[in-house]
Amino acid sequence: MTKTSFIFSTDIHGSEICWRKFLNSAKVFKVDALVLSGDMTGKIIVPILRRPDGKFDATFMKEKYVLSESEIPEFGKKVRRVSYLPYVTTPEEADRIAADEGRREKLFEDLQKQVVKYWLDLIPEKVDRNCRVIISPGNDDKLAIDEVIKQNPHAVYGEENVVALDEEHEVACVGWTCPTPWNSPRECSEEELYERMKKVVQQVKNMKTAVFCFHCPPYDSEIDRAPLLDKNLRPVVRAGSHEFGPAGCKATRRIMEDYQPLLGLHGHIHESPGFIQIGRTKCLNPGSEYGEGILKAYLVEIDGDKITRLQRVEG
């Protein structure tokens, strides 16, 4: 039997602070692997507007800045730390981008690819070469970042594939989810999702030692409870409290029940950290507080077909 340890995290949504903590955790906990289940990228652009006098205007976290050109790199770092994407442009170009959805989406795509490449290039600086870094994008990640991950020599691309955790344990990865209110890049019907998952897990050699890294947690599992939304996508509030309900995927639950792997790694629902049991399968969700720069993760040790350690990690 092979014993291995890894840190699992998810839903860092462009937070460079969380990404650096994730990489640093490899040496802190002396693990054999890091596993990230999307959503990796940020979704908000902060324009840095060039003025005629050579200065630059920007608004960040409701605060206005006037920057010199030499101050832009440091300001950009500050913006990226909290999941936003800095972009230097002119007021005229910013107006054109705002009015053109196609141009806006292309810009998001390009900026996200730049950030992902930069992040992956930090791996050899932070992580021992013998520690595998397995990444499977999530529903909020644009498809364009996949090629960036595939081409990087420091990361293992897992999406819709089965990759080796070690010589005995395999990780089957699917980052797609069932439909959400946000029309994200990787979502589909429950029926299609089940077929996607089934196609991947059928490549697994040994279910007793397998790990399923499915971004969306099982439906109605206590690790999938999210605030309920009304038809205007506003939280439902009753008696002064938010109403919560299940928001996971029925396809995930069905696959877990049918195939019974050793472990299920999930995310997607930030508000529901914890772990549950489905038959012999332990399913966990670390949750996410990326906006506060808090890394939420699990330290996992497995030995053959047994889980020998399961510890919440936050920092």
Short names for language-model regions:
Residues 14, 162-168, 184, 188-189, ...:
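Binuclear metal-dependent phosphoesterase catalytic core
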